[in-house]
Amino acid sequence: MAGHSKWANIQHRKGRQDAKRGKLWTKIIREITVAARAGGADPDSNPRLRMAWDKATDANMPKDNIQRAIQRGAGGADGESYEEVRYEGYGIGGAAVIVDCMTDNRTRTVAEVRHAFAKHGGNLGQEGSVAFMFKHCGQFVFAPGTSEEAVMEAALEAGAEDIATDEEGVIEVVCAPADFTAVRQAFEAAGLKAEVDGVVMKALNETELTGEDAVKMQKLLDVLESLDDVQEVYTNVVFDEAQ
């Protein structure tokens, strides 16, 4: 993978997400509401709400917006009732794609997701068709130049499972989903800030796409991420640095 740069891929994805900040806020508010409804309004006793709260803070969401979403969820206020749905499918060249949704209308959502796949060179698969290619875990990615020793010390004390540094100096820390908040707090206490973090579906093996295939795959991912009911899109694809 001579042209594959993990850091370039991370920066590219982060830039796309930042450009969709309004959309991102909507998705985070939905996540906060569902988390509060399921586990209560106290982020200290509701790990899922804590993660959503931290995500909102990282996205510069005003605290009033966060509190309103919590109150709406914890208070059981009338309104939409969302269910979580996961779809699996294939993109260009058989690339694996997982689409996590929150929806108040499963029929509408599956139709939109299926249409996006079909229109942009992919196809919707059956449950379990690609999930085995991913690991559910907490993930932290630190920029080149970050002290590997400091990251390792904080991570291991907090119970991280794996720490790896690539040839570019990008440090990746993986932990169990249940340990995500503890590891994040350990990094904060050590003055360390990950470039990206979250509880994710991490690809076990990567597939590199270049040229026209990369352009088509990027379009498919963009369309899926733009759907109102879609919360997260995961793929095992990495793109050539030139893309």
From Swiss-Prot:
Specify where it is mainly localized. Answer: cytoplasm
Gene Ontology annotations of biological process type: regulation of DNA-templated transcription
Keywords, A to Z, come to: Cytoplasm, DNA-binding, Transcription, Transcription regulation
Q: Which InterPro entries match?
A: Integrase-like_N (IPR017856), TACO1_YebC-like_2nd/3rd_dom (IPR048300), TACO1_YebC_N (IPR049083), Transcrip_reg_TACO1-like (IPR002876), Transcrip_reg_TACO1-like_dom3 (IPR026564), YebC-like (IPR029072)
The keyword S-adenosyl-L-methionine appears for this protein: no
Q: Which is an annotated GO molecular function term of this record?
A: DNA binding
The entry's family comment says: Belongs to the TACO1 family.
Task: Kindly give the Pfam families that the UniProt entry links to this protein.
Answer: TACO1_YebC_N (PF20772), Transcrip_reg (PF01709)
Q: What organism is recorded for this protein?
A: Bordetella parapertussis (strain 12822 / ATCC BAA-587 / NCTC 13253)
Q: Which Gene3D superfamilies match?
A: 1.10.10.200, 3.30.70.980
Q: Does the keyword Membrane apply?
A: no
Annotated region Disordered: the residues are 1-21
Where in or outside the cell?
Cytoplasm
- GO CC, one annotated term: cytosol
Q: What is this protein called?
A: Probable transcriptional regulatory protein BPP2422
